[in-house]
Amino acid sequence: MRPLVIKLGGILLDTPAAMENLFNALAKYLQNSDRSLLIVHGGGCVVDDLMKRLNLPVRKKNGLRVTPSDQIDIIVGALAGIANKTLVAQAAKFKLNPVGLCLGDGELTAAKQFDPELGHVAGVIARNPALLDNLLSGGFLPIISSIAVDENGLLMNVNADQAATAIASLIDADLVMLSDVDGVLDADKTLLSELNSAQIARLIENKVITDGMIVKVNAALDAAKILNRGVDIANWKYPEKLTALFAGEIIGTRIAP
């Protein structure tokens, strides 16, 4: 099987019991599988909490966090520090051989600033898989934060969905986006197991997919097009289903390219 990139988001990083359930499911899955696994994470809730404790303002432009030079160190500390090492600690508890990384380590990705008005915010593309190839062949679990380094050596904040897509592209992996939603629901609130771009456009037009779910679905669709294969949206709240998900079964919604 291809390697599997698991993108973590939502309030999982703020929910210790959910993190424990996730890594317990990973450990159980790996008892009977030699599939290579990687985790990519953001951590907006961790950033917001730290900014609040430091009485720092949070500014956004078109839904994207503005990251000025005097705040990038705070965001790096939250994502590559607090969030990353919290996940590493939970994975270590289950003997998963975790290694905490960021997108800039080993030149995994190349980063380019999005918009000067957003500050230290960048997009990334896959660059050099050597570090991940070595770690995966050695039986390690890479846990990668969405902090990158640009060509000028500047630290950059990257959208975690795009970060996960770049890492999946780098090593030709499947991608699962874990969140606090079951998947995409139809007008009758029934879970839709598979969707393509035309169906998604119709559901958005008919206001069945709305608000934050539009962002999640479009992120998965963008990833599916880049990877040229289905990308799953699934819920981390059901640990009993996660081992099936890691094995390739659909438990949420699979977005086709």
From Swiss-Prot:
Its EC number is 2.7.2.8. The keyword Transferase applies. Pathway: Amino-acid biosynthesis; L-arginine biosynthesis; N(2)-acetyl-L-ornithine from L-glutamate: step 2/4. CDD domains: AAK_NAGK-NC. Keywords: Amino-acid biosynthesis, Arginine biosynthesis, ATP-binding, Cytoplasm, Kinase, Nucleotide-binding, Transferase. It comes from the Bacteria. It holds the Pfam family AA_kinase. The record marks 7, 216 as: Transition state stabilizer. InterPro entries: AceGlu_kinase-like_sf, AcgluKinase_fam, ArgB, Asp/Glu/Uridylate_kinase, NAGK-NC. It catalyses: N-acetyl-L-glutamate + ATP = N-acetyl-L-glutamyl 5-phosphate + ADP. Substrate binds at residues 43-44, 65, 157. The keyword Transferase applies. It is found in: Cytoplasm. GO terms for cellular component: cytoplasm. Its main location: cytoplasm. GO terms for molecular function: acetylglutamate kinase activity; ATP binding. GO terms for biological process: arginine biosynthetic process via ornithine; L-arginine biosynthetic process. Belongs to the acetylglutamate kinase family. ArgB subfamily. Catalyzes the ATP-dependent phosphorylation of N-acetyl-L-glutamate. HAMAP family: ArgB. This is Acetylglutamate kinase. It comes from Actinobacillus succinogenes (strain ATCC 55618 / DSM 22257 / CCUG 43843 / 130Z).
